[in-house]
């Protein structure tokens, strides 16, 4: 059985090398941007088993005022992949954000890569749906999925900008 613990800045520094391993440079934020996001309301979620051993991480961007979130980066550690741990983590995240209007997930390089197609199928089996709106990250085609009440197409850009704002908003 797993549970989610909220991580802090020391945890972010510790897991960032894993983030570098799990995600391409063009699709992951810098360590400084991750820390800035934590200061401004993003959440680092750590998946822990009953003995306290860490099994994975997720970095969530949020617009808490409007109740939107983005599951930006999620990974289960390689030594325990393939045993349903990712599905359990996703279910815990769904429960944690159940009161949010909508939670988004981006699947990069979709439908180009087989890995991206499998990942999209995994998220769809857990209740996420395609927005049907063309979307790109770093010039690469990206599938935008949602769970909950998705905003109208005309409002989507503003919603996503607000969700990303804690990490990429104005820096003073």
Question: Model features per residue range: what roles?
Answer:
Residues 46, 53-62, 68-75:
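Conserved beta-strand in the GNAT
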Residues 9-10, 50-53, 63-66, 138:
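Short strand-connecting beta-turns/loops that link adjacent beta-strands
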Residues 1-29, 155-166:
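Short amphipathic alpha-helix that is part of the acyltransferase structural core
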Residues 76, 82-95:
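Conserved acetyl-CoA-binding loop-helix of GNAT-fold acetyltransferases
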Residues 109-132:
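Conserved active-site alpha-helix within GNAT-family acetyltransferase domains
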Residues 116, 136-172:
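C-terminal "cap" of GNAT-fold acetyltransferases
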Residues 97-114:
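Conserved GNAT acetyl-CoA-binding A-motif
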Residues 20-50:
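Active-site rim helix/loop that mediates acceptor-substrate recognition in acyltransferases
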């Amino acid at each position: 059985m797993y549970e989610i613990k909220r991580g802090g800045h020391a945890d972010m520094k510790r897991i960032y090398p894993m983030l570098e391993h799990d995600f391409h440079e063009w699709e992951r934020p810098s360590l400084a941007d991750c820390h800035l996001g934590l200061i401004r309301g993003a959440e680092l979620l750590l998946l822990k088993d009953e003995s306290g051993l860490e099994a994975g991480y997720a970095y969530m961007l949020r617009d808490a005022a409007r109740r939107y979130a983005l599951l930006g980066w999620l990974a289960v550690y390689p030594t325990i992949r393939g045993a349903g741990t990712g599905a359990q983590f996703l279910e815990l995240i769904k429960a944690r954000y159940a009161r949010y209007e909508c939670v988004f997930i981006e699947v990069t390089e979709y439908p180009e890569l087989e890995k991206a197609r499998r990942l999209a199928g995994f998220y769809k089996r857990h209740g996420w749906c395609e927005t049907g709106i063309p979307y790109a990250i770093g010039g690469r085609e990206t599938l935008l999925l949602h769970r909950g009440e998705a905003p109208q197409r005309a409002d989507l850009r503003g919603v996503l900008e607000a969700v990303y704002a804690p990490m990429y908003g104005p820096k003073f």
